[in-house]
């Protein structure tokens, strides 16, 4: 399943939930430098969907806050629940 996420770096409260436009919000404590925020976002999304970190891949948006991720085996109901937070 492809998921659009919006990464918010340097957040005091890291986590996954809520939405900004059509994108799932992923808050990370890491700065948006050297791919640190992206790596943290991939790990948080993997944990939120209960899949291994290695199975979540970045499709587009390596240098953007809005990213498209491929999350194989992601449950659409889980996505709806996370967007509603």
What are these regions (language model features)?
Residues 10, 21, 76:
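ATP/adenylate-binding site constellation spanning eukaryotic-like Ser/Thr protein kinases
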Residues 47-85:
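C-terminal structural segments of small proteins and small subunits
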Residues 15, 19-51:
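Compact, glycine-rich, soluble single-domain proteins
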Residues 7, 28, 71-73:
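Hydrophobic residues in beta-strands and at strand termini
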Residues 8, 12-15:
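Active-site-proximal or metal-binding-adjacent scaffold patches in catalytic folds
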């Amino acid at each position: 399943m492809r998921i659009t996420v919006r990464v918010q770096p340097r957040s005091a409260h890291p986590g996954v939930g809520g939405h900004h436009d059509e994108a799932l919000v992923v808050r990370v404590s890491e700065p948006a430098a050297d791919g640190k925020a992206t790596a943290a976002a991939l790990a948080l999304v993997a944990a939120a969907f209960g899949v291994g970190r290695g199975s979540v891949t970045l499709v587009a948006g390596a240098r953007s806050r809005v990213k498209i991720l491929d999350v194989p085996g992601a449950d659409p109901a889980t996505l709806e629940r996370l967007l509603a937070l």
